[in-house]
Design a protein with these regions (language model features):
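Conserved catalytic cores of phosphodiester-cleaving nucleases, focusing on short active-site segments
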Residues: 21, 72-74, 78-88, 100
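Active-site metal-binding core of divalent-cation-utilizing nuclease and nuclease-like domains
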Residues: 44-78, 217-221, 228-237
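A structured, charge-rich N-terminal accessory region that forms the first stable segment of a protein
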Residues: 1-49
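Gly/Pro-rich interdomain helix-loop hinge
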Residues: 95, 99, 105-222
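Short hydrophobic-acidic sequence motifs that mark active-site Asp/Glu residues
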Residues: 69-73, 81-85, 239-243, 250-252
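Active-site-adjacent loop/helix micro-motif of nuclease/hydrolase catalytic cores
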Residues: 90-99, 261-267
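Polyanion-binding interface signature
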Residues: 182-278
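Short, flexible loop/turn elements at secondary-structure junctions
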Residues: 65-67, 76, 87-90, 104, ...
């Protein structure tokens, strides 16, 4: 029902999402087993998703609130340390997970725990950026457990639940609404596509082409969501790359000068001539 107020329509910040994740993690503790059985069981499935362990028996989950500014930090079964960097629509910056993991490993009371670092993303992000993030982390800490949890991963667990808890249902509906908007490019005419629909289209394009990247490009007229791919050097000049860029409804051929812009006009003129010939 679209008329029903949703808490997460107003609680849009990452702090609100931190609070929900911590709240749900605490529901996985065995002490909550009789309070709301369905919610407890879903919370346990959520922990198994985060730890990538389908058969884990969960007895205790203890959340550590804002310790060392970590978004979400929890100890499971006094055996696993769970660090979550939580993002809605922003991206990872400043190697937060690396800093968090170094801090946890340096603390005597946590040093023996099996550490799991998670990038939890409920907004849309390009596969290329997520892949770079994973490679960046695992290259430095090859022995550590690192995983990316997406909105689809979370929904696959939450939607199985039979709980009627209002906070839980609001969060699930909130994520499903983002998913529906993202998928709406499949059914809506292009002129009606929202920001999320363009993101969904670019994600599908990225998957289909197995290359490219996309993101927001700022400019004085308000910016746009761009998708760029097919980078090639001009044979006669390795200082210049040409590539294709989709600026929502506009397809462009772009040139990029590695060594500065002094010859940009000449290269652009050559490109225009080439395009006319084709």
């Amino acid at each position: 029902d679209n008329m029903k107020p949703n808490l997460f329509k107003f609680a849009t910040s990452e702090l609100s999402q931190d609070a929900f994740i911590l709240w749900l993690l605490e529901w996985a503790d065995s002490e909550c087993a009789t309070e709301d059985k369905a919610l407890h069981e879903t919370a346990q499935e959520f922990v198994r998703l985060l730890l990538n362990n389908k058969d884990l028996e969960i007895n205790s989950v203890k959340c550590k609130k804002q310790e060392h500014h970590i978004d979400v930090f929890a100890i499971v079964n006094e055996e696993y340390a769970l660090i979550i960097e939580d993002k809605t629509n922003t991206s990872e910056h400043g190697n937060q997970l690396k800093r968090y993991s170094e801090w946890v490993k340096g603390k005597e009371q946590y040093s023996e725990l099996d550490l799991h670092c998670i990038y939890y993303k409920t907004g849309n992000e390009s596969y290329a950026k997520l892949k770079r993030l994973e490679e960046n982390y695992t290259k430095e800490y090859p022995e550590e457990n690192f995983s990316i949890i997406t909105r689809e991963d979370v929904l696959s667990v939450l939607k199985q639940s039979t709980t009627t808890n209002a906070i839980f249902c609001d969060y699930t509906e909130h994520l499903q609404k983002i998913q529906d908007l993202t998928d709406s490019y499949l059914s809506l005419p292009i002129k009606k596509w929202s920001w999320e629909a363009w993101q969904g289209f670019y994600m599908a394009l990225e998957k289909e082409l197995q290359t490219g990247d996309w993101g927001y490009v700022a400019n004085p007229s308000g910016g746009f969501l761009g998708f760029w791919w097919n980078w090639n050097s001009i044979a006669s000049n390795t200082d210049v790359d040409i590539y294709l860029q989709l600026e929502e409804k506009k397809l462009c051929v772009k040139s990029y000068q590695k060594g500065g812009v002094e010859n940009g006009y000449v290269y652009s003129s050559q490109l225009i001539e080439l395009a006319r010939e084709k």
